């Protein structure tokens, strides 16, 4: 899996963890057309999406009321479609929690 230059620090670390484990998730996968929602990482054969949430230590887009509502709509739609979404903060990725949980989910 190549690592695009526009990744956040958490996404970059998660991509490297995936490489180390021999995993090749798809990146920036659009789902639920005509919506333009994207998953940061997606394992299509397992219907498993991974989202690395940025801006959790500040009042970022995902924590503002409209951003939170849009995220809820996105994740609810994914659930209705049978897609499991695992969400992680950058700190969780750096500690190794994210890759551990993804490996467990892929068993």
Features from the language model and the residues they span:
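Nucleic-acid endo/exonuclease domains
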Residues: 1-107
């Amino acid at each position: 899996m190549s690592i695009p230059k526009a990744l956040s620090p958490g996404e970059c670390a998660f991509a490297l963890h995936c490489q180390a484990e021999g995993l090749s998730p798809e990146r920036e996968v659009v789902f639920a057309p005509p919506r333009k929602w994207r998953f940061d990482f997606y394992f299509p054969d397992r219907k498993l999406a991974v989202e690395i949430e940025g801006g959790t230590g500040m009042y970022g887009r995902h924590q503002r009321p409209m951003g939170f509502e849009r995220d809820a709509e996105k994740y609810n739609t994914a659930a209705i479609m049978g897609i499991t979404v695992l969400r992680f903060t950058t700190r969780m990725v750096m500690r190794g929690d994210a890759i551990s949980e993804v490996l467990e989910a892929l068993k």
